[in-house]
Regions:
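Secretory targeting and sorting signals
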Residues: 1-27
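Low-complexity, acidic Ser/Thr/Pro-rich repeat tracts that form intrinsically disordered stalk/linker regions
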Residues: 26-36
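Long, low-complexity, mixed-charge
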Residues: 34-59, 109, 114-119
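Acidic Gly/Asp/Thr-rich repetitive segments characteristic of extracellular carbohydrate-active
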Residues: 45-92
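Acidic glycine-/aspartate-rich tracts in secreted/extracellular proteins
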Residues: 74, 96-99, 171-172, 362
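Extracellular beta-strand-rich solenoid/capping regions of secreted or surface-exposed proteins
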Residues: 78-86, 101-165, 173-191, 197-206, ...
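Right-handed parallel beta-helix
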Residues: 162-172, 186-199, 220, 226-243, ...
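Extracellular beta-rich repeat passengers
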Residues: 318-442
Length: 442
């Protein structure tokens, strides 16, 4: 792979992370390739919210001709859609597929997407607050940035249809530079894949975001929007060769080129997220994307279990409206960018039990939770450890938060009890969880 050169020198002639594209045609997958056929596995009864309703079976009922192995971006795009085709399908990803690759296999760079004369140098010069002020950018350069963004979006955004299983084969299967969208569909399984570096070449400057303005990007590694019955399992989510710690700053703010790792929004419902590794993103995951979206009430029911949340800055997850069960996860809290892990937002109903929080770099137990306008959070059986070693000790997450933030105190009223749980393990069993999560293990 080639490393994407960030625009520290203010040039758009940079190449996105690329892998050598192969030219093999999509073909029926050999389901005997692996000693255990994971392509037709379904989410077990009682395994989190994703097992509720009609359950999550993905493409397990696919006919043999609808089981396809892919190793290029064009093959992948064709295999997972269209959304109006509800036939069960299984898509087996062989190797690493780079979203920034043309149909002929040519790697695409940010410069290839830039249109209408856009350049970062000119954008920075035009909208520097010392020149432009603190109003929203507008005019030909902002229009060119937006048009360039849309050109890239047409290439890297891929929509998944209903009744689909996408599964990786081997240790290195995955998607890089792809923004996978599971929108307004049902019954989708995503397993044994790396989802890496959905890089936005054209972040927009918002001078009114926060006290000093922020750069905002558009692409999540995966976005669930209006989707029902989804299982995301044994996958790895990261920034690939473009970690947030190495991004430059412009106008005093980090030039943020990533959005979320796995965002769940707009009445998405009945989701199980299990045995995944989420790595070193600032804003990792939201459940519900707006306080004003009251139509989310009664939806956004999500279970997170046996995941490793590793070096994330915030939103692991941040919840609005939904009933969200967070159990048996391992959190590694580290780094200067850390803000909080569990965010209790408007009308959130977070239920956190038997999780391990490994506190590093001086991070305290009172920083694990933050109240973003919520009322209550139920938490029991959780434990902390320090710097990856020593004995674990019980922690009252709400009491620790309230002691640190008495002006934003949370209650502990239980408004619901999780039903779809196979077994909650004792917290001591979660200490070794990190070695059992992520892609390449199935």
């Amino acid at each position: 792979m080639r490393r994407l050169a960030l625009p520290v020198t203010l040039t758009m002639a940079v190449a996105l992370t690329a892998t050598a594209a192969t030219t093999a045609h999509a073909a029926p997958a050999d389901r005997d390739h692996h000693p255990r056929d994971i392509t037709r596995q379904v989410l077990a009864d009682g395994d989190g919210w994703g097992s509720a309703g009609d359950g999550t079976t993905g493409g397990s009922a696919a006919a043999d001709e609808d089981v396809v192995r892919v190793d290029t971006m064009e093959e992948f795009r064709a295999a997972v859609g269209p959304r109006d085709d509800d036939r069960p399908r299984i898509v087996v990803v062989d190797g690493l597929i780079d979203g920034n690759t043309a149909a002929d296999g040519t790697p695409l760079s940010c410069a290839d997407y830039a249109v209408d004369g856009y350049s970062l140098e000119e954008y920075l010069a035009a909208y520097d607050p010392e020149v432009w002020g603190w109003e929203d950018p507008e005019g030909p350069l902002e229009e060119a940035r937006d048009a360039s963004y849309r050109t890239q979006a047409a290439q890297i955004r891929v929509k998944v249809g209903s009744n689909t299983t996408v599964v990786g084969t081997g240790e290195d299967a995955g998607l890089t530079g792809v923004a996978l969208q599971v929108h307004d569909v049902e019954n989708v399984i995503l397993r044994n894949l790396s989802f890496s570096d959905a890089y936005d070449c054209f972040p927009g400057w918002d001078p009114k975001d926060g006290n000093t303005g922020n750069w905002n990007s558009e692409y999540d590694n995966i976005e669930l929007s209006g989707a029902t019955n989804v299982w995301v399992d044994h996958s790895t989510f990261d920034d690939g060769d473009n970690p947030g710690s190495e991004l430059p700053e412009y106008f005093g703010s980090k030039y943020e080129v990533h959005d979320g790792l796995l965002d769940i929004a707009r009445q998405a419902d009945l989701v199980t997220v299990s045995y995944n590794h989420f790595v070193e993103r600032d804003k990792a995951m939201i459940v519900g994307n707006s306080d004003s979206r009251t139509t989310d009430r009664g939806h956004l029911r999500v279970t997170y279990h046996h995941n490793h949340f590793d070096g994330l800055g915030q939103r692991a997850p941040r919840v609005r409206f939904g009933q969200v069960h967070v159990y048996n996860n391992h959190y590694t809290l580290a780094g200067d960018h850390f803000q909080y892990s569990l965010g209790a937002g408007k009308e959130s109903q977070l239920y956190a039990e038997n999780n391990v929080f490994d506190l590093r770099d001086g991070i305290g137990a009172g920083e694990i939770v933050y109240n973003w306008g919520g009322t209550d959070l139920v938490a029991h059986g959780n434990a902390v450890m320090y710097d990856g070693r020593g004995r674990m000790s019980a922690v009252d997450l709400v009491a620790e938060h309230n002691a640190l933030h008495p002006d934003r105190a949370l209650g502990t009223e239980r408004t619901w009890t999780p039903e779809y749980v196979q077994r909650v393990q004792p917290v001591w069993a979660i200490r070794s969880l990190p070695r059992r999560v992520g892609a390449g293990l199935l």
